[in-house]
Amino acid sequence: MAAAALRSGWCRCPRRCLGSGIQFLSSHNLPHGSTYQMRRPGGELPLSKSYSSGNRKGFLSGLLDNVKQELAKNKEMKESIKKFRDEARRLEESDVLQEARRKYKTIESETVRTSEVLRKKLGELTGTVKESLHEVSKSDLGRKIKEGVEEAAKTAKQSAESVSKGGEKLGRTAAFRALSQGVESVKKEIDDSVLGQTGPYRRPQRLRKRTEFAGDKFKEEKVFEPNEEALGVVLHKDSKWYQQWKDFKENNVVFNRFFEMKMKYDESDNAFIRASRALTDKVTDLLGGLFSKTEMSEVLTEILRVDPAFDKDRFLKQCENDIIPNVLEAMISGELDILKDWCYEATYSQLAHPIQQAKALGLQFHSRILDIDNVDLAMGKMMEQGPVLIITFQAQLVMVVRNPKGEVVEGDPDKVLRMLYVWALCRDQDELNPYAAWRLLDISASSTEQIL
C-alpha cells in the first residue's frame, strides 16, 4: 500500500508512509478525510498522502482541555476572592468606619455614666424625702394631720357599715323584692330570647306529651276563642283583578326570570348567601304574596281563624325549642307513648314498627342529639286533616344501638351524622291551645356522615 502511494504521489495513511521516511509537501481536504502530497527523502518524486481523521478529538485531548478550563476557572475564582478580601480589608481600615466606632463607644460610655448619676441622685432624693417626712411627723402639724387621717378612716368605716345595714333593710322591703323579681324576669326573658338562639342544644329535662304543659310559661299563655272572620287579606279568585294578576305572573318574562333567581337564591348552599337570608326574609315578608303561593296564604288564613296571635317566627321558634326536641328525642330513644301522642296514626305506625322490633330483641337505644339548626318554613298546604305547614331543619346525631351485652349492633358512637329532616305539621282545628294543636302528619329524612 505504501508502494502504491509512492507511485501515485498521494497518500491517506500518514503513519505508515512516515515510517518509510517520506516527507509531506502539501495537503488537501476531501469529503472523507485529508490527503497529503509527499516526496521521497531524495526529493526526486513528489508524493501525496491522505489521512482520514474525521475531525474528532481523542478522549485524552478532551480530558486535558476540561482540566485546563477548570484550572482557568479556579484561577479566576481565586483572583475574585483575593480582590474581595482586599476590598474588605480596605473598608475595615477606612477612616469613616473607625470614626463611627469611636462615636459608638463614646455614646455607650456616656449612657452608662448618665445612668449612674441618675441612680445616685434618686437615692439622695429618696433619703431627703424620708428625713423630711420623719421631721414633719414629729412636729405638731404632723401629729394633727395624722390624727385627722385616722379620724377620717374611722368615719369612712362607720359610713360603710351604715350603708351596708341600710342596704340589708332595703333588701327586706316588699318594694325592693318586687323590683328585684322584675329585673330577674326581664333578664330571664332576654336570656331565653337572645342567648337561647346561639346556645348549644340541651335535651329537655322531661319529654312532654302534646297535651301537657312543660311549665308555668305554657299555663300563663292566653287561649283565644275561635274567630270566624278571616284576618288575612287574600285576593279572592272571584275578584276581577285575579285573572289579570294570574296572567301577569305566568306570562311576564321579567317576573318569571326574577322568580327563577329567587328560587336559585333560596336553594343555594353558599355560606355567604345563607348568612344573608335573614335580611331577605324580612323583605319577603314585607312583599307578601309576591314570592309565595296563594296556597300558603290560604293556609295562614285558616290558622289565623283559630289562633289570631299566630306568628311565623314564633312558630319556628316553638318548633326548634319544643316540638322538634320532644318528638326527635322520643324517636331516637324509643319512647312510643310520646310518639303516639304527637303523631297521626299512619306516621306513628311507620316510626313505631322498627322500635318495637328492636325492643323485642332486647336491644337498647343509646343515641343522642348534638345540635338542631336551620329550622325553616318551606311551604304550606291545605289537607283534609287541616292546614299543614312543612318545615325543614338539620340535626347532628350520634346513632348507637346496643345488645344486652353492651355490644354495638347498629351505628357508631364515634361517628356524627348530619340529618336533613322534612316534617309536615298539621294544625288541629279542634284544639285551641297553640302548644297542643300541632301534630306530626308526615316525615322524611336523609343522612350524610359529617367529617368535621
Swiss-Prot record:
InterPro entries: NTF2-like_dom_sf, Tim44, Tim44-like, Tim44-like_dom
Residues reported in the UniProt entry to bind ATP: 166-173
Phosphothreonine PTM sites in chain numbering: 128
Keywords: ATP-binding, Membrane, Mitochondrion, Mitochondrion inner membrane, Nucleotide-binding, Phosphoprotein, Protein transport, Transit peptide, Translocation, Transport
Compartments, as annotated in UniProt: Mitochondrion inner membrane; Mitochondrion matrix
Bilayer topology: Peripheral membrane protein
Signal peptide, first to last residue: none
Keyword Mitochondrion: yes
GO cellular component, one term: TIM23 mitochondrial import inner membrane translocase complex
Record-given protein name: Mitochondrial import inner membrane translocase subunit TIM44
